[in-house]
Amino acid sequence: MRKIILSALAGTAALAATPAFAQDDAQAFNGGHVEAITGYDHISDGDDGILYGIGAGYDFRINNVVLGIEGEVLESTAGDCLGNLCVDAGRDFYIGGRIGAVVAPRVLVYGKVGYSNARVEVTQGNVEDHANLDGIRAGAGVEWQFRNSPLSVRAEYRYTNYELGVERHQGTLGLAFRF
């Protein structure tokens, strides 16, 4: 009889613990986050480079739909030289929104759109100048949150169309801390 009671208590405890895991998954992609970002950067008519920076945002989860706002500050090594004329990509600011669907308990597929401002630095000999370019960024990605952890990783492709016909293609990886 004692074994039956202990087995029943153990089974009840296991069933009671199950909703706790489901609740953790239900809270995935809800709240604030900060992230480190790195990836590939290509600017039209220029050499490829590496981008790196930080981002922050806040997500609102409604059932399996996620709405979010986010911002980023990035730097890039992309640039090109022709003789003594060099054009280098500088910093890149972004602010925008994203909408996504939770397709598995800790997997989010999303699209994003927003405003981007990039600084391009031009050097000819000893003379330096810069220009700020405004543009629209659109992208898509997937984010995976680790089980029972505030960490998530994301992979993303984004395209930005700046004024003066300048285009940018980026492939990024991010490591986010969610709170």
Regions found by a protein language model. Name each.
Residues 2-5, 19-179:
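Gram-negative outer-membrane beta-barrel domains
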Residues 8-10, 14, 20:
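Cleavable N-terminal signal peptides
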